[in-house]
Curated annotation (Swiss-Prot):
SMART domains: DSRM, RIBOc. GO terms for molecular function: double-stranded RNA binding; metal ion binding; ribonuclease III activity; rRNA binding. This is Ribonuclease 3. The gene is rnc. It catalyses: Endonucleolytic cleavage to 5'-phosphomonoester.
Amino acid sequence: MKNLFFNKLQKKMGYLFHNNIILKQALTHRSFSSKNNERLEFLGDSILNYIISDALYNNFTNIPEGKLSQMRSYLVRGNTLAEIAREFCLGDYLILGIGEVKTGGKNRDSILSNAMEAIIGGIFLDSNINKTHEIVISWYKNRLYSMSLKNLKKDPKTRLQEYLQGNKFSLPQYYIKNITGESHNQEFTICCFIDDLKKSVIGYGKTRRKAEQSAAKQALLLFNIL
């Protein structure tokens, strides 16, 4: 039953592990066990940076080094990794300690992004660099090839507002759906609703502002304009 459960995640990610022990370790947070995903995260971080650097270098041949670095930072940062994790519903598969479960750890950006890096490290150990490159690029494809240097300087809420205004749609409404965790370590869940389109998306963050930005980014993804 457990293997079938993990198979759903692997299908979403587009990669089937040969060694399920590696996958389980990649999903295990330090709050649950000393045999956790931190070493895999260390490995995956370096591999992710290499893969994204390689993709940017070969696909943006006229962009100078400084701009390439800016683009890479945007793509490998924790918020972006957490968004990809949510596309896979990764939080539902994380192995967390009781304390993290109670405080909403499965929705926390830092835990999700670290797990994504660990999974990348795990795929590398389970296969090879070429296969890992193929899988990671499949996750990043839309983000990678629709990037705009101008838009990198604008936050998601601004970009969403400009897009909606430009298409004569109503402006988005943001409201708090949930708040979890202790007062010093809260996690906000924000709903972004666009009335004209009858569309709503969810964002998460440690502050209301960050959660609103996260929700706006999900809306941009919905419209395929990120």
